[in-house]
């Protein structure tokens, strides 16, 4: 499905720009045969799309309610994080918890084979500022030496919106530590990479254009991370997955992802 900032085929560029759009790990016990590797983990912060609270070109009301993760485009819809990872080959949902607080409306944990766990948090759409701040704070937190950690943000690129600019003053600074970070949002290399570097983290997948931050891209990156893929391989996997679901060429898909503004 292509909505809003996700497809330049359907919206003019000016409209697209306006749209561009723990923590302790909770999980329900899996069966005894379903052991997972506790030392390889991704925390995904999902800012639910919100027709009212975000400065976007509205998507259909059913998938654009930022207070209802169940059918939200980035969470409960077909290519939303919860639905897609629950059904993708090799993945299983370990458990979910509703209403973590007034901002995090649902938290789910997933596992891919026995190699990786993913914790995904669905943030209320009107609190995209807090979602971005929490993402940056986690990116600034050095990884545990005994673990492999990645943090990812999925949603509208709130840093494009003037109303969210004050949150930048609260973004943390830290000496370099190399925690890998991913931002699946429109034009995220331009808007996030510099802040991630200042936070000490290592941006490995960001975007150069308007795009659909849907879960098939996250899924491809996660599998690569579990298999200890290089940064270039992670970006290539993201592009190939994007091309498949957007029905574009592999070359065009790969051109969406990269990190130009890194050291």
Task: Write out the residue ranges for each language-model feature.
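Caspase-like cysteine protease fold
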Residues: 232-263
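Catalytic cores of nucleophile-dependent amide-cleaving enzymes
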Residues: 145-224
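Bacterial N-terminal signal peptides
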Residues: 15-28
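Boundary at the C-terminal end of the N-terminal hydrophobic targeting segment
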Residues: 32-34
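Surface-exposed patches in mature extracellular/periplasmic domains of secreted proteins
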Residues: 91-98, 206-208, 233-237
């Amino acid at each position: 499905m292509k909505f809003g900032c996700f497809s330049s085929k359907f919206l003019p560029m000016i409209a697209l720009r306006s749209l561009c759009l723990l923590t302790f790990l909770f999980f329900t016990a899996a069966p005894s045969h379903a052991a997972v590797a506790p030392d390889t983990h991704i925390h995904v912060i999902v800012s639910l799309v919100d027709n009212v609270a975000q400065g976007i070109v509205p998507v259909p009301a059913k998938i654009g309610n930022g207070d209802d993760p169940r059918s939200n485009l980035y969470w409960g819809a077909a290519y939303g994080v919860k639905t897609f990872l629950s059904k993708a080959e090799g993945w299983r949902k370990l458990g979910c918890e509703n209403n973590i607080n007034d901002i995090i409306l649902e938290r789910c944990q997933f596992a891919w084979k026995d190699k990786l766990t993913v914790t995904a948090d669905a943030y209320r759409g009107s609190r995209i500022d807090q979602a971005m701040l929490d993402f940056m704070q986690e990116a600034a937190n050095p990884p545990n030496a005994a673990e492999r950690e990645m943090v990812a943000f999925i949603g509208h690129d709130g840093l494009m919106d003037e109303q969210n600019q004050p949150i930048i003053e609260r973004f943390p600074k830290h000496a370099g530590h190399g925690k890998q970070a991913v931002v699946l949002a429109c034009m995220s290399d331009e808007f996030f990479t510099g802040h991630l570097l200042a936070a000490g983290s290592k941006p490995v997948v960001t975007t150069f254009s308007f795009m659909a931050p849907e879960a098939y891209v996250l899924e491809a990156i996660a599998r690569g991370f579990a298999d200890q893929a290089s940064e270039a391989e992670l970006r290539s996997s993201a592009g190939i997955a994007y091309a498949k679901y957007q029905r574009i060429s592999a070359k065009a898909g790969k051109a969406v992802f990269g990190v130009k503004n890194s050291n």
